[in-house]
């Protein structure tokens, strides 16, 4: 199961290499927490880190039932994140900007929870990669790894990132160097005896004689490992040539810090053999599987190279994702900045800062990998539960969203810090999801009922005023009838006056005309 998860992680990483978008493209399209391609790689890294937790629980004294329940809970968390993506018809419907359009602070809070989750997973991936290197390399090899990586990074900075095609070709060549170095290391570093679990991280003696094959293999391994993690720095560059050069320098500087601090983590891990506990040694079960004698040496070398490359690639993808989330889901809603250049600076600065924090956390050789993986995956549970509620179109208010995110994140951190609850692993996903969903559901229903009561209260006065309204309507109708009657009366009076005037005029006209007798008398006078 663990090896299958590692192989799946490696395959997802290579698919991500060919299909990734630049940071500027993500900012233009609105890609943040929910719909970026790097999110798939992050969840795949969760699968690999999840494989460490059941083995730690079982070897630490937990029963098989607890181990199985923890594994099932972890798989359920991943499916809870993946299923809404599969159900969605188009990626645009998954953006956090649309999901959290009601409240910009809820959007920023969701981004902050996801940034913490990615930071924890990144530190766990880097710590795991450092322990893989410490289990395979000798002391001088670990130092040679840092020197070779630094040299290759200087060459990368001088060449610059002029085009994506050139970086792809360089990455393919460096990946081939990793495979070649793995085969060389299989013949030199892997012994014929099985490595005991308790002595897996024990310091190895430095070789007295350094052959040219050893130095060549160290250089090839360092160049190959840096080449695989050099892909994410391409995502830190914008499309313009000037921004690409600037983003390339920032990315390569972050990769140089990654390589040097990973080498330092390997050295500290070897120097801290006396402080290693049984649970810390038990968490190296994955390393023992790829370095045990029962596997052929070439296959063991390929698995070691694949595991290291996949972990470093996932760490780089998660750093890029942190930058995108910080710019799109935190800085944009809080500041209202919509210009591309400030958002790009915020994204690159957040990616570099998260890289430094993750490297510092990964330097602790006594920190169990379970702490990193458990905290990161439980915080991812909070994010997945929140987004699942939004995908299901729950009626929630900003207060419920804030309380759900706060309680879920507090439960995740507390579950990972308390030793008694930490033993149960990913079973903590259940209370974290419930504490995230219940405030949204309860407060959403409370606000809905409150709105319904307010609506009913506004309707009640209208019902009591119905008789008065009817009386007012009747009075208005009576006034209208009275006004019409008055108008008709006025019209009849006016017609009567007109008739009287006409009759008077006719009478005057008749009086003014002479009669027939007067006409005859006048004729006789003539």
What are these regions (language model features)?
Residues 1-52, 156-159, 172, 178, ...:
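Membrane-interface "cap" regions at the ends of multi-pass membrane proteins
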Residues 1-14, 398-455, 459, 522-526:
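A generic transmembrane alpha-helix motif of multi-pass inner-membrane proteins
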Residues 8, 78, 113-124, 155, ...:
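Selective recognition of specific alpha-helical transmembrane segments in multi-pass small-molecule
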Residues 11-20, 122-126, 130-143, 147, ...:
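Hydrophobic alpha-helical segments and their helix-loop junctions in multi-pass secondary transporters
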Residues 27-92, 220-224, 233, 241-275, ...:
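Membrane-interface helix-loop-helix modules in multi-pass membrane proteins
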Residues 66-157, 220-221, 308-317:
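Helix-loop-helix module between adjacent transmembrane segments
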Residues 93-101, 159-169, 227-260, 278, ...:
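Hydrophobic, small-residue-rich membrane helices and short re-entrant helix-turn-helix hairpins
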Residues 102-109, 118-119, 324-366, 370:
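Loop-to-transmembrane helix boundary motifs in multi-pass membrane proteins
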């Amino acid at each position: 199961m663990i090896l299958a998860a590692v192989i799946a992680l490696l395959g997802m990483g290579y698919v991500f290499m060919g299909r990734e978008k630049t940071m500027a493209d993500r900012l233009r399209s609105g890609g943040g927490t929910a719909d970026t391609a790097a999110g798939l790689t992050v969840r795949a890294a969760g699968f690999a880190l999840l494989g460490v937790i059941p083995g730690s629980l079982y070897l630490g004294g937990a029963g098989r039932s607890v181990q199985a329940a923890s594994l099932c809970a972890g798989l359920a968390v991943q499916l809870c994140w993946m299923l809404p993506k599969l159900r969605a018809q188009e990626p645009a419907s998954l953006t956090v900007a649309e999901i959290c359009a009601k409240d910009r602070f809820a959007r920023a809070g969701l981004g902050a929870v996801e940034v913490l989750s990615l930071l924890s997973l990144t530190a766990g991936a880097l710590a795991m990669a450092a322990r893989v290197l410490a289990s395979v390399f000798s002391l001088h090899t670990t130092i040679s790894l840092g020197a070779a990586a630094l040299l290759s990074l200087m060459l990368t900075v001088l060449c610059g990132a002029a085009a994506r095609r050139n970086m792809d070709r360089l990455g393919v060549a460096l990946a081939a160097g990793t495979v070649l170095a793995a085969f060389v290391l299989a013949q030199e570093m892997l012994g014929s005896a099985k490595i005991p679990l308790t002595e897996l991280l024990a310091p190895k003696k430095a070789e007295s004689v350094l052959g040219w094959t050893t130095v060549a293999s160290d250089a090839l391994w360092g160049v190959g490992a840096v080449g695989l993690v050099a892909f994410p720095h391409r995502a830190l560059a914008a499309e313009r040539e000037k921004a690409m050069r600037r983003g390339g320098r920032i990315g390569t500087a972050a990769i140089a810090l990654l390589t040097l601090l990973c080498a330092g983590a390997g050295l500290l891990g070897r120097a801290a053999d006396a402080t290693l506990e049984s649970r810390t040694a038990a968490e190296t079960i994955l390393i023992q599987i790829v370095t045990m004698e029962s596997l052929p040496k070439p296959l063991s070398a390929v698995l070691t190279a694949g595991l290291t490359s996949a972990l470093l690639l996932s760490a780089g993808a998660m750093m890029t994702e942190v930058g995108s989330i910080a710019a799109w889901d935190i800085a944009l809603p809080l500041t209202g900045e919509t210009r591309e250049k400030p958002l790009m600076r915020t994204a690159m600065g957040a990616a570099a800062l998260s890289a430094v924090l993750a490297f510092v956390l990964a330097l602790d050789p006594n920190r169990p990998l379970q702490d990193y993986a458990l905290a990161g995956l439980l915080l991812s549970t909070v994010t997945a539960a929140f987004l699942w509620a939004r995908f299901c179109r729950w009626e929630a208010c900003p207060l419920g969203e804030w309380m759900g995110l706060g309680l879920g994140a507090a439960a995740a951190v507390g579950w990972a810090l308390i030793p008694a609850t930490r033993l149960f692993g990913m079973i903590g996903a259940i209370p974290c999801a419930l504490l995230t969903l219940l405030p949204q559901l309860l407060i959403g229903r409370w606000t809905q009922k409150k709105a319904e009561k307010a609506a009913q209260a506004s309707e009640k006065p209208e019902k009591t005023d119905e008789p008065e309204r009817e009386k007012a309507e009747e009075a208005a109708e009576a006034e209208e009838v009275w006004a019409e009657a008055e108008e008709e009366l006025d019209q009849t009076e006016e017609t009567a006056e007109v008739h009287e005037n006409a009759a008077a005029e006719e009478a005057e006209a008749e009086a003014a005309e002479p009669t027939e007798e007067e006409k005859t008398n006048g004729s006789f006078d003539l």
